[in-house]
Amino acid sequence: MKMRKVGVLGLGHVGAHVAYSLIIQGIVSELVLVDLKESKVASEVQDLRDAQMYAPHKVEVNPGTYADLGDCDVIVNCIGDITLCASNNRLDEMSFTVAQVKSYVKKVMASGFNGYIVNITNPCDVITDLIWKESGLPKHKVFGTGTGLDTSRLVSKLSLQTGVAHQSISAYMIGEHGASQMA
């Protein structure tokens, strides 16, 4: 297996699940966890180290800083604050996430990072574009999950309602990840 180093920024609900999924699937050789809450990082690192003990592969899990991300192949951006979304509008997080992105992207790029960035943070399309512009990376190196989750939800519901296996359903959500998307 090619050695792959992945950094996960933001260890809330989504970031912690991303890290766990990467550990269990064994598709990374090293995982670096970064969050402003050091106690959260320490807890997640220990939980992930414990969780992989029965997996058929070993992943090195480490706490880190933005400076430790320079040699990552991929960074997954999960920074956000769901408490700002009282109205269930993903745009409510925008001022917080814009400020966070502008702060951390400079630090990450100063570390020599030249890998790929996958953005999950809301509002996904706006933040993905901002990461691309702030990083100076080529367009093909910055991705957003966009309506991927919404597409999964649609296919799941169609499968449950029709009895057709989800693997046999081709359906997509398009548009902005939010109220303006459509099937």
PLM feature spans:
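Conserved N-terminal Rossmann-fold NAD(P) cofactor-binding segment
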Residues: 36-72
